[in-house]
C-alpha cells in the first residue's frame, strides 16, 4: 500500500496514517509529497496494489473535458491528467485499488475512468475531513477482515451519513 499525503498544515492526516498503519499484513509505504515527480517516482519504485492519496482536491470543468486537481500543498495544484500515464503503468503492474481522499473528486474519476483501475474511490463533494476518515476506517476494517471490496465499500458508505444528505454514492 502506497500512501501519499499532501502537506497542508490545515489538513490533519494523522488519523488517516494511524488507520493505514493498523492494517494487518500490509507493507505500508508513506510519504508527504511535494511535487508531481514525487508521485511519479513512488509509483514507479513501489508498484503498489493499493494507492491512497490524501489532500485537498477540486474538479475543474473545461470546454470539452473535466480534470481533477490535488493540492500537494496550498500553493501546488496538480492536475490528475498529468499523472494519467503513470497511473496506467501502475495498473499494468498490479494496482488494484485507488482511494483519493480529496474533496470534489469527480474530475479525478473522470480522468482515470479509462485507465481501468479495478476499484477507484473518490469523494464527489466537499466533505468534512472527519467524515472521510470515518469512511476510510470502516472501509479498511471491513476489507482487512475478509469482506469483498465492493461489499466493504457498501457497508462503509452505509455507516456514514450527515443529516439527510448521502455524501458517498456507489
Where are these regions (language model features)?
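Short amphipathic alpha-helical segments, especially helix-boundary/capping motifs
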Residues: 58-61, 83-86, 112-117
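A domain-level signal for caspase-like cysteine endopeptidase catalytic cores
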Residues: 1-77, 111
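Secondary-structure boundary motif
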Residues: 22-25, 45, 88-92, 145, ...
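Caspase-like (clan CD) cysteine peptidase catalytic core
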Residues: 71-104
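Active-site-proximal C-terminal subdomain of hydrolase catalytic domains
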Residues: 92-170
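Short hydrophobic/charged patches on amphipathic alpha-helices used for structural packing
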Residues: 39-41, 84, 88, 109
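Mid-sequence, gly/pro-rich, charge-dense loop/helix-turn segments that line enzyme active sites
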Residues: 65-78, 89, 145-146, 155, ...
Amino acid at each position: 500500500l502506497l500512501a501519499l499525503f499532501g502537506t497542508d498544515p490545515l489538513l490533519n492526516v494523522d488519523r488517516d496514517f494511524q488507520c493505514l498503519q493498523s492494517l494487518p499484513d500490509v507493507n505500508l509505504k508513506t510519504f508527504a509529497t511535494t511535487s508531481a515527480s514525487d508521485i511519479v517516482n513512488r509509483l514507479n519504485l513501489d508498484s503498489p496494489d493499493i494507492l491512497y492519496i490524501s489532500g485537498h482536491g477540486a474538479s475543474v470543468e473545461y470546454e470539452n473535458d473535466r480534470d481533477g486537481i490535488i493540492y500537494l500543498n496550498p500553493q501546488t495544484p496538480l492536475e490528475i491528467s498529468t499523472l494519467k500515464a503513470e497511473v496506467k503503468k501502475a495498473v499494468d503492474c498490479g494496482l488494484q485499488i485507488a482511494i483519493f481522499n480529496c474533496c470534489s473528486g469527480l474530475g479525478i474519476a473522470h480522468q482515470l475512468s479509462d485507465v481501468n483501475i479495478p476499484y477507484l474511490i473518490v469523494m464527489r463533494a466537499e466533505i468534512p475531513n472527519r467524515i472521510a476518515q470515518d469512511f476510510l476506517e470502516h472501509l479498511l476494517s471491513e476489507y482487512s477482515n475478509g469482506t469483498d471490496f465492493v461489499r466493504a465499500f457498501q457497508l462503509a458508505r452505509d455507516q456514514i451519513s450527515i443529516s439527510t444528505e448521502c455524501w458517498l454514492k456507489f
